[in-house]
């Protein structure tokens, strides 16, 4: 059978159309099957409490079949777990260095948290409440203290977790130096005094989504990373 030029054109386009339909069906099947699974995410306490729920909720609205396993720990421990491939990715507070890719997701300002307004010049004579935090956060706050008061921070009462420190502050037992999320003052009725550098700028701590550089990731993890880049990333 010999086709006319018009018939040959239609036959060629019909073949292309069938191949297109086949590719679309395969793509939809792959998309559906690969975007089912569990993502193991590390997150420090404060990010989990104030930010992570909203991030996961927004992502879950688009991807109903994805489950999450959340590992709560300090950022330095989470960063090590990422480097050692114990978790696929994690949110870490502070600028940790290593063989990773990272996405800036939050910048938190530092404050002195107290029951009542304070005079910064009298701060060294006041009761300090310390708590468990990561090394990078401590380094930033300790450096500010040394630059401001000329000596190391005093050893204060140790509260363990930061939320217990806030509760002790609320009882008037001292002050705490913390990086706080937006909206903190709506949850805790405490006095916040901004911690500023010599130029009057806020002391900032970065929070990153971190994952191993060059590692082959599943489509589920890659999709979550893309969601963070498209919806959460702070572009400096």
Predicted regions and their residues:
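Short, well-ordered beta-strand segments
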Residues: 38-42, 90, 129-130, 176, ...
